[in-house]
């Protein structure tokens, strides 16, 4: 029995399912999860000492590569000054100023510790600001695990085929309207029927939790136009896409100014840090200025802020996103070209984020993604993993490239994909 098997058995005896986040359990692909011992650059090593080229990237945060020496040094220096204070720090101001400078839609910003906190509070804030209850989300979009959002959500919920979570009272979700992504007609109908009751629309501006799904230009324009017309708050959930698809996030690519933005992952540089921000008049409804409550013992943790500040510095260096985008396109295009005869396969990418689909076409919504060949993905996933390439253990997860990947490493990955596709077609 190898170390991964030993540790998984040990974990299952004390941790429900053996993991602290469901998708890590390999439930949708089968087999034993790899317990990671260390990570550096574009690689991770499991407890057996096996090295993998990593395209999970801690599910997005590791944009500069794992254990980047400058980030590690920033964390070390911050830790020497104390781990947590429960009081304001200059670093909090600095990172808020940095984010606001990069994202003009962010006039005011509040730090929290997780993407779930950010989206949960942004929705509470939208409801408090508008005095309305209803919210719109889209099937397959994942916005964390707060109760009102666990309705036809993405990520692990799609992996396990659950349209919602047990333990969530129906009353908690009765104000949540779930529409099809990229379906303008449904969006227009929802506002025609309930426009004066809708507090907000929350959307992943590029979906990453039913694999990578792009919005159409018309859909994006409809989101902004209808929310403005009806006085609803448009929330861009950029926890995944922020600083990942472009320096200014998806909103900079769309040319859209959302009312509120949630962010996380990259801004913490691998540490637990997230944020929500946006229009001054909305943000000033949050306590202590307004009546919408939010608090957190570890919000703005100085160690996480130090990691985030250094990461933001690195990603603003000349050529960073041009290089990252080129690497990601090289990977997606290379794997798509490597597919074997008789295997339906497509790929897409934006910035440092990519999608691999065992389907004839790139999906436009959850229904499209649900028709993909999940069994083929399982075979591909394990074929790549057995050859030292780690993708996310779910057909519904987007993948990530970092600045630590090189063209040579991408080409090695594509060569392995050629082998795996041939084995699948045999």
Swiss-Prot record:
Named cofactor requirement(s): pyridoxal 5'-phosphate
Any Pfam family hit: Aminotran_3
Record keyword Signal present: no
A GO cellular component annotation in the UniProt record: cytoplasm
EC number annotated for this UniProt entry: 5.4.3.8
Any one GO biological process: protoporphyrinogen IX biosynthetic process
InterPro entries attached to this UniProt entry: 4pyrrol_synth_GluAld_NH2Trfase (IPR004639), Aminotrans_3 (IPR005814), Aminotrans_3_PPA_site (IPR049704), PyrdxlP-dep_Trfase (IPR015424), PyrdxlP-dep_Trfase_major (IPR015421), PyrdxlP-dep_Trfase_small (IPR015422)
Highest taxon above the source species: Bacteria
Reactions it catalyzes: (S)-4-amino-5-oxopentanoate = 5-aminolevulinate
Cellular compartments annotated: Cytoplasm
Pathway membership, UniProt: Porphyrin-containing compound metabolism; protoporphyrin-IX biosynthesis; 5-aminolevulinate from L-glutamyl-tRNA(Glu): step 2/2
Keyword Lipoprotein annotated: no
Disulfide bonds: none
Record key words, sorted: Cytoplasm, Isomerase, Porphyrin biosynthesis, Pyridoxal phosphate
Modified-residue entries (N6-(pyridoxal phosphate)lysine), positions: 265
Classification via SUPFAM superfamilies: PLP-dependent transferases
CDD domains reported in the protein's UniProt record: OAT_like
Main location as per UniProt: cytoplasm
NCBIfam families: hemL, PRK00062.1
Subunit structure: Homodimer.
Family from the record: Belongs to the class-III pyridoxal-phosphate-dependent aminotransferase family. HemL subfamily.
Protein name, as recorded: Glutamate-1-semialdehyde 2,1-aminomutase
Organism: Neisseria gonorrhoeae (strain ATCC 700825 / FA 1090)
Lineage: Bacteria, Pseudomonadati, Pseudomonadota, Betaproteobacteria, Neisseriales
Gene name of this polypeptide: hemL
């Amino acid at each position: 029995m190898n170390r991964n098997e030993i540790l998984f058995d040990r974990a299952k005896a004390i941790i429900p399912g053996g993991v602290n986040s469901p998708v890590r359990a390999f439930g949708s692909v089968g087999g034993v999860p790899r317990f990671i011992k260390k990570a550096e650059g574009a690689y991770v090593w499991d407890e057996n000492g096996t090295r993998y080229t990593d395209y999970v990237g801690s599910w997005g945060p590791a944009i500069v590569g794992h254990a980047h020496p400058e980030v590690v040094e920033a964390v070390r220096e911050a830790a020497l000054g104390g781990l947590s204070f429960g009081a304001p720090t200059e670093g909090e101001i600095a990172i808020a100023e940095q984010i606001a400078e990069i994202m003009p839609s962010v006039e005011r910003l509040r730090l929290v510790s997780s993407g779930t906190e950010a989206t949960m509070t942004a929705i509470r804030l939208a409801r408090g600001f508008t005095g309305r209850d209803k919210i719109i989300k889209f099937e397959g979009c994942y916005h964390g695990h707060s109760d009102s959002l666990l309705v036809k959500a993405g990520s692990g919920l799609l992996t396990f085929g659950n349209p919602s979570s047990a333990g969530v009272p129906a009353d908690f979700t009765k104000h949540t309207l779930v529409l099809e992504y990229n379906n303008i007609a449904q969006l227009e109908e929802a506002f025609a029927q309930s426009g004066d009751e809708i507090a907000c629309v929350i959307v992943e501006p590029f979906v990453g939790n039913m694999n990578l799904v792009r919005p159409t230009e018309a859909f994006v324009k409809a989101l902004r136009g209808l929310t403005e017309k009806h006085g609803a708050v448009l929330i861009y959930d950029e926890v995944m896409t922020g600083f990942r698809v472009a320096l200014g996030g998806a909103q900079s690519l769309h040319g859209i100014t959302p009312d509120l933005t949630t962010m996380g992952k990259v801004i913490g540089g691998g540490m637990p840090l997230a944020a929500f921000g946006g229009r001054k008049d909305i943000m000033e409804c949050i306590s202590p200025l307004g009546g919408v409550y939010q608090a957190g013992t570890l919000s703005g943790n100085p160690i996480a802020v130090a990691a985030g500040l250094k990461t933001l510095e690195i990603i603003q260096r000349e050529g960073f996103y041009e290089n990252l985008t080129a690497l990601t396109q090289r990977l997606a295009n290379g794997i798509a070209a490597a597919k074997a005869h008789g295997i339906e396969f497509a790929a897409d990418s934006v910035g440092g984020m990519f999608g691999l689909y065992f389907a004839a076409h790139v999906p436009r919504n959850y229904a499209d993604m649900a028709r993909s060949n999940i069994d083929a993905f399982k075979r591909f996933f394990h074929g790549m993993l057995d050859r030292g390439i780690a993708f996310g253990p779910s057909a519904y997860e987007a993948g990530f490239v970092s600045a630590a990947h090189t063209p040579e490493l991408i080409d090695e990955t594509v060569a392995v994909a050629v082998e795996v596709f041939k084995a699948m077609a045999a």
